[in-house]
Amino acid sequence: MKSTLSYLLIICSLFTACIGHQEESLLFYVDTRTGTAPSATHTAELFGKNTEEYGQTLPAVLEPNGMNFWTPQTQDTEAKCKAPYYYKDTKIQGFRNSHWIVGGCTQDYGSMTLMPVSGTLKYLPQDRGSLFSHQEETATPAYYSVLLKDYSIFAEMTGRSRSAIFRFTYNQPEDAYLIVNPNSDEGKGYIEIDTIKKQIRGYNPVHRIYQGWGEPAGYNGYFIIEYQNEIEEYGTFRHDSLFAGQRQIADGTGIGAYLRFKIHSEGPILIKAASSFTDMEGAQKNLDTEIPHWDFDRTRQELNSIWEQRLSQVTVQTNNRNDKEKFYGALYRASFLPRTFNDVDGRYPSFSTGHPFRQSANGRNYYEDYSMWDTYRALHPLVNILTPKKAGDMMQSLVDKYEQGGWLPIFPCWNSYTAAMIGDHCISALGDAYIKGIRNFDINKACEGMLRNAFRTPATYEEYKNGMGRRALNSYLKYGYIPLEDSVPEAFHTCEQVSRTLEYAYDDFVLAQVLQKLETSDDYFPDPQKTGLYDTLMIRARYYRNVINPSTGYAQGRYADGSFLTDAGNAFSFTRFITEGAPCHYTSVSYTHLRAHETSAHL
């Protein structure tokens, strides 16, 4: 009874604090769980059964554009289209340093999960999951807490970009365990227990999807866990086999480690964690720099202040609380990606290969995970307005990828080429930033990469297959559109020829504006090869007209001989020549009207 009352007092005090300050703190307009439940929209019913009907968001604790998204876990996989947490799930399996591409349908990578349990040792995620109630969750950008009912453990989490601190209050201190496991679906990874340093260390190898599916990405997600308490028992496990007293284990399905703490009275214990994409030393330095102490409330206040500053960049002039919740919740979700990829000392793995390690210059961050087809229209322009310096660092990171990999990426994720989705929208993002006055990136090197993508195709098939270069560029240049005969086989989204044509036309327009701006700018580095390219690109910017069927007024598939597809009933039907939609409808991108650079054509 005493224990139950203590938890109720903790929860009530937190709730009272929220009520007392809800008009002072913008954080209380943000429920980080929004988007984790299935959508009830008509679009969701038509498209993406069992995957994209979810918002695919996370109730994460993070710094804006931080490395890790610290999230409760209800799904024990890094598989494609499986977010770590779904609102409808009934059991929490632990707390993860997720690198999920929020809002998308890709994969998590390089993550680990830790979980406090009590009583009988249960270590596999599907066995150790605890019932919980959404009424007993607190989910803000800077703090998450929940009562794990099966164990009577009150779990709290806060953190920084690369690190986190947890406070677990055990009701059964004589059987207080901590479970840690790398989340490798490929059965790879390593974990070790260091009882002298009071640490658990390990790594989870990163693997690619889309181009190079299943291949190693060339680097690992390293992690380090630190604890203060003495322990009475430790060991490792692999799937359903437990190895008491063993300090390390490598590879195999479902590996991990466990500790049993030596505590004999009620009260919280503290756990710290950090990660790195370079090495274990990087993870240690990240932890020592970001959370060099054991003060949970201090870290929480630091992250609170960071989010107050972020959210207060925009003032919503309304007394409608629902509108404020929608807006500030959206601003929170617009602060996930791209993510910081470097350690506090500036080191990060090379783009595309993982090695050698690179060093970001002048104290800037190197960013990764650009879901570019989804973000070039609105997210990156928003970053340009709210945080122009960060926007420039994000653009320089794209330039770095070009210099390290040889081609400007199409859809850079998990620090690799992917050729996922369509378009060539790093051009759009770079051009938009430069035209709008962002100057803290190398525009001449960026222009070199943009021109390479716009006019050249990789010399070898292996490079192209690996995701380098614009898809179907040769067809686009030959016909002025991508004909239906070109199925675009070396892409995750094959076909979609009309959508690609429309997207490329806009990219070419943006590149033309950059060239025109550079000719009258102090940034311009004279290059005879650029002469006349503006006119060429402006002609290509009108290629979108080549896939508008004059007899219907809609975008339509076109053959190499110039004839249009004759299916007159396809304007509102899903079709392979349009990306995730139909030529003209209200449930997806209305590609017929994707010509933002010629708005007069809509009239």
Regions found by a protein language model. Give the residues of each.
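Accessory carbohydrate-recognition regions in carbohydrate-active enzymes
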Residues: 21-380, 384-428, 434-502, 506-520, ...
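Bacterial Sec-dependent N-terminal signal peptides
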Residues: 1-23
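Cytosolic catalytic cores of cyclic-nucleotide second-messenger enzymes
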Residues: 603
